[in-house]
Structure formats: structure tokens, C-alpha cells
From Swiss-Prot:
Subcellular location: Membrane
Cellular compartments per GO CC: membrane
Designated name of the protein: KANTR integral membrane protein
Chief location category: membrane
Membrane disposition: Single-pass type I membrane protein
Organism: Mus musculus
Cytoplasmic side: 56-76
KO phenotype (gene knockout): Homozygous mice have tremors and a propensity to develop spastic movements upon handling.
Signal peptide interval: 1-25
Spans traversing the lipid bilayer: 35-55
Keywords: Membrane, Signal, Transmembrane, Transmembrane helix
Topological domain ranges for the Extracellular compartment: 26-34
Gene for this chain: Kantr
Length: 76
């Protein structure tokens, strides 16, 4: 594993931890707020952002490997 891959995994882990804590706080906000539509919108944006960030980091980490190319050949 290269140092760049390790750095990407560390950034991914910390960003996932941060976004999970943020979404937990937003779900608590959803319970106690009067404008629930805005809180629900914020919660969905944070969730979609975290999923897309993790997917992109995994994709770019696996892109150079030959195993990933083999998987692409199998599914496409």
C-alpha cells in the first residue's frame, strides 16, 4: 500500500466519522425543530455527500489495480 493510498484511507475515515456525527446532530435537530423540512433537507444533503465522497475515494483508490479492471470486465 502506497503512502498516498494510506493518506486517502485516513482522510476517508476521519471524514466519515465527522459526517456521521454531523448527521446524528441533524437528526436530533429534526426532532426538536419547528421547520422540519429544512432539517430533513440538510440531513439528506449530508448523507448524500458522505456516500458520494466515500464512493469516490474507494473508486480512485481501486482504479489503478488490475483486480478492479478484472471486476469491470466481469460486470460490463
Amino acid at each position: 500500500m502506497s503512502p498516498f493510498s494510506l493518506l486517502i484511507l485516513v482522510i476517508c475515515a476521519f471524514s466519515l466519522f465527522f459526517l456521521i456525527n454531523l448527521s446524528r446532530g441533524l437528526s436530533i435537530l429534526l426532532v426538536f425543530t419547528k421547520n422540519q423540512l429544512l432539517a430533513l433537507l440538510l440531513l439528506s444533503i449530508v448523507s448524500l455527500f458522505s456516500i458520494s465522497l466515500i464512493s469516490a475515494l474507494i473508486f480512485f483508490d481501486l482504479l489503478p489495480s488490475t483486480f478492479f479492471g478484472f471486476i469491470l470486465l466481469l460486470f460490463f
